């Protein structure tokens, strides 16, 4: 799981 991708979704 990519952390950057996850952060992007969470901070969307």
Curated annotation (Swiss-Prot):
Domain of life: Viruses
Its job: Structural component of the virion.
UniProt-recorded name of the protein: 25 kDa structural polyprotein
Organism: White spot syndrome virus (WSSV)
Upper taxonomic lineage: Viruses, Viruses incertae sedis, Naldaviricetes, Nimaviridae, Whispovirus
């Amino acid at each position: 799981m990519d952390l950057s991708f996850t952060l992007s979704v969470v901070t969307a």
